[in-house]
Amino acid sequence: MSLLDALNEPQRQAVMATDGPLLILAGAGSGKTRVLTHRTAYLIEECGVNPYNIMAITFTNKAAGEMRERIDQMVGYGSESIWVCTFHSTCVRILRRYIDRLGFGTNFTIYDSDDQKTLMKDICKRLEIDTKMYKEKMFLSAISSAKDELIDPIEFETRAAGDYVKRKQAQVYREYQQALKQNNALDFDDLIMKTVELFKLDKEVLASYQDRFRYIMVDEYQDTNTAQFELIRLLALKYQNLCVVGDDDQSIYKFRGANIYNILNFEHHFPDATVIKLEQNYRSTQNILDAANAVIANNQGRKEKRLWTDNGAGDKITFEQLDTAAEEADFVARDIARRVRKGEYQYKDCAILYRTNAQSRLFEERFITANIPYKIFGGVNFYARKEVKDLLAYLKTIDNGQDDLAVRRIINIPKRGIGAASINKVALYAQEQEISFYDALCVAEQVPGLGKAAAKIRPFVLFIQSMKAKAKLLSVADLLQEVIETTGYVRELEAEGTDEAEARIENIDELISKAVDYAEVEEAPTLNGFLENVALVADIDSFDENSDYVVLMTLHSAKGLEFPNVYLAGLEDGLFPSYMFITSDNSQAEIEEERRLAYVGITRAKKNLTITSARVRMVRGQTQYGKVSRFVREIPPELLSREIYEPKPKEESIEQSAFQKARKAFRTVPSYGGSGYGKEVGEGYGSTFHSSKATKPVYTKVENQRDFGSAGGTLSYQVGDRVRHIKFGDGEVMAIVSGGRDYEVTVDFDKAGTKKMFASFAKLKKV
């Protein structure tokens, strides 16, 4: 069987176009990964290209892993020499070899967002900046944007001219970069910027990589920023065999620095480029695709394409406009439960996508009440947890003593009796001597005014030195366990004897497991490599397609994923698109970015798509009346199951209906007894359609439900009782405080730790 037999005609053309610049415009679900893997195999098997000369760049570890697996299966022997990496991991591999030419050590540390915040806090304190007026986040954002555009501190300062805030940012940027270099550390933006700097500084290094990577493929090209574009341009400059795959209609990361003009102007940058469109979709039904096509056609800044499929027309798109956001969440919860009960879908087939993270709260509350398993993406990353960061800081210190943030984090973990005053004296001495904090600790007896504290520092230094020696002999997992054992970190947690401490120990066990897994998959595992691997992990990479739970995530997080049953929630003008973009000075460009986001959301659905909106919702504590989003109104009526109807009631009727319902939603909970689940879509909800004969949703007042509890009634439990929560499990009631309309209950759960919650939502059962 030929490599090309499984491909459609445009896909075959893309695979066989091997020489010169190539732009593949790959619509959503059009099989771009298949094209990239087949193209790689075709280069090797049909064109005789050495695998060593091929590079494939993606944006996420998940995508890189999937592509690597497919290439290994297709190519077999020799595939291991192909670079299949993310932009960041590609740059790390290059910098580990040559960054010493820029004055950094090759064992540099990669700072995550928490490290950046800590460093920025130190800099603002040192520069005596009023952080109430100038937020650390503002400085970090300005610096990140500058690096995306390859603007260094000197150029930034030049551009600042007479702008006071820009000049302040320039000052902080300069100090920030100096601190990074002193710590022998790079942030994520530096990884790409420093690689470009290296290539421009050292033509020999650039030439060596140009000769190696004669065939370059870049996935998700529409998401590249200026720095990434320049990196690719430099690498492809000599041989011009650059294949980029992307979809301008899915360019949704402008806020991260993505430049849509990289893909729109590809033919301008590479005049000899071939352009091939992949428009056949293998994911969705034609009705879903027609809706997506109709919406995105309203954008002016795009390359014309129209998705089609052989999957059939499929069901019409369901649109439900509810009176309140609470009713919207209630509708979605009931609809999912009904479909799962009827065997149409499993929970894992369902996803709720929304514009802002704040929208998840009501869905969470309804799912807990309805006993629907769910998971939110975008929560606390595993590697951001205290115990994990503490132990990683030990490993970073062992690997790179120049990393001041890591050393200062663990100098008193566990407590060594080294006071803040002593630490400040060491830090000041390090600054004056222009040495690292760790190097200053090594000569603590020379620090003025340190006195007896130097004796307390000495054991810490000796411990780190001994670990540095052991790091050359032990695996990462064994080294980690040695650190845990010698410091007594876990023993201290065990001594606490709390469920929270037990959960933290489980996280430490998971970190050890991660170290073991790393050693099993890497040919030459190193401590530095492990830390690099951890630093490059993103939250979405942990998405488990096999676990049976409903997924809740923002539309930005959903890109690249697909689900049989999708709910797009909160489709109202003012929320999506947001009021900020509607009223901005550059509103057309902003609205087009939002429309691309809507297009991404629609095309996540494989079989069923439900779009919901609310006539009124609480936003930042204010009542907001929402008109159905323009993106819904751009969908042809014949594709929707019902006609959109937007009545124009008098102002007082709004106050007496929607607003009162919004207030009521915060005082009551829906009854999930026997009324609601199993009804057809649109039944039992406040939907506003011409054809709707639906009654209002049934709500049961809290005070009439003894098990829920309220300040107006009695609770079935008291302090000291054992209770059960639908999500957190069993625990002991520690406190009950009356809050007027409701009780605030504090429960120490066996596994989830201590939680405070309102009795009406908690639905605690005495056990």
Describe each PLM feature range.
Residues 28, 213-224, 228, 248-249, ...:
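Conserved Walker B
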Residues 158, 162, 346, 360-372, ...:
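Conserved helicase C-terminal RecA-like lobe
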Residues 30-36, 99, 271-274, 279-373, ...:
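Helicase P-loop NTPase motor core
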Residues 19-22, 40-215, 237-240, 260, ...:
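A basic/glycine-biased coupling hinge at the interface between accessory DNA-binding modules
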Residues 4-19, 227:
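N-terminal pre-P-loop "Q-motif" helix
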Residues 571-753, 761-766:
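C-terminal accessory regions
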Residues 20-38:
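Walker A/P-loop
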Residues 3-6, 42, 218, 226-322, ...:
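Conserved RecA-like helicase ATPase core segment
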